[in-house]
Amino acid sequence: IRQFGSGVVGMPSGSIEEVFRKVESGDAAYGIVPIENSTEGAVNRTMDCLLKTPLFIVGECSIPIQHNLMTRSGSMEGVTRVYSHPQSLGQCVQWLNRNVPSLERLTAESNGEAARLASENPTYAAVAGEVAAKIFGLQIVAANIQDSSTNRTRFLILGREPAEPSANPREDKTSLIFSVPHRAGSLYQALKPFDDFGVSMMRLDSRPAKRGTWEYFFYTDIEGNMSEPKIREALEIFREGCASLKCLGSYPTEKNFRRSDTKGSNL
């Protein structure tokens, strides 16, 4: 709502992959997926989906994340398992170790799925947000169990068409996925044009190429918009040093995001 306004219609999804599918098929106009957390780092499922999707990143937002332990009864009596998304379990690991060390920890596709499982079995608990507790009729046993008081997650906004440059494209962000030849120094040489043209890199993560060899894809955010001559020139030279390159889009950063007319749109 903060990004799109009150006219947006929410469509909950059971997994990150489902969000991509709904936007790709046209069932939803936009999708929102997590990309990185201040405690646990990159969300690998999202990075893998970005590699294959035809969608574009059109915006971003970040929010503080609060996790709660919840059950059907509001009590931990008889509870033997706790479900949550792997990232959420990681963000609460110290609290769980201190307070419920005997619970078996199992992963779910999403925190919403974890809450659904807990709603169907009195021996299950879930780590999820307050909204999930309301949707699935669960009682919060312990609130704000995340280990970091400054826990935040950055989300990407996905669309089928690229975003228009903002009023100040120099403050936009461009996201790329690329691979480099499998030889010494290739990553350094590939990234050198960004330094030569004074383009700031804001993030660099790697993911296995999953081809059975020690090869990787890299995900990076650079400062600026592809509409800028400097960015275009840097990318042209950058492309020469890459084995593959996919541009995920140029888009306004969170502070510069201006919501468009999304009245009646599905999100």
Where are these regions (language model features)?
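Domain-level signature for soluble enzymes in the chorismate/prephenate branch of the shikimate pathway
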Residues: 1-267
